[in-house]
Amino acid sequence: VVFDISAYVLDDVQGIVDILEGRIGHYVFASSTVVYGASDILPIAEDFPLDSTEYQSQYGRDKIICEKYLMDLHRKTRFPVTIARFSMVFGPDNNLIDREQRMFTRLLKGREVLIPGRGTTLGQVGHVDDEARALRLMAMNPRTFGEIYNITGKDYFSDEGYVDTCAEVLGINP
């Protein structure tokens, strides 16, 4: 099994496929829930429309392109791919250094945490251990080939609620 958490653009994916095609049991591509369009309804299901508009970030557009390539490849050649769309991941050994730490540092220093808009945007976060468990369940499971899964926590937070929860963990009033 190859868990590819490093491919961001089509060239990355095509390079791996060229090397591994015919010699791999399972390729799991790490995508992102950022590929979806805006929604006031949570949870977002895997068949929710993708956002390919000009408002989508380059990162999101590139993930959509990679997903389409891999799903087309699966349909044409049965390439054993599963797409895992992650939301924000938190926990130890996070590969995005300082994601949570920046906010915790601001809270601990009594500095304002900047929240976009009114802080009412809803989202989900997933703990790295839970998301790793989901990947293990997918590994070498033929029922997951050609499928897309949202991998995230079960709880929803507003941006403001997320900051408040972090402040509560620290025992401070933001």
Task: Please place each PLM-identified region on the residue numbering.
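Short-chain dehydrogenase/reductase
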Residues: 42-68, 97-101, 124-125, 156, ...
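A short C-terminal helix-loop "cap" of Rossmann-like NAD(P)-dependent dehydrogenase/epimerase domains
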Residues: 49, 104-116, 172-174
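NAD(P)-cofactor binding segment of oxidoreductase domains
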Residues: 1-50, 61-72
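Hydrophobic/aromatic beta-strand patches that form the interior of the parallel beta-sheet core
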Residues: 3, 28, 82-84, 149
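Substrate-positioning beta->alpha
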Residues: 97-103, 116-140, 146-147, 161
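Conserved beta-loop-beta element that borders a ligand/cofactor-binding pocket
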Residues: 31, 67-93
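Short, solvent-exposed loop/turn segments at secondary-structure junctions
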Residues: 9, 34-35, 88-90, 120-121, ...
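Mid/C-terminal beta-alpha module of Rossmann-like enzyme folds, strongest
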Residues: 137-174
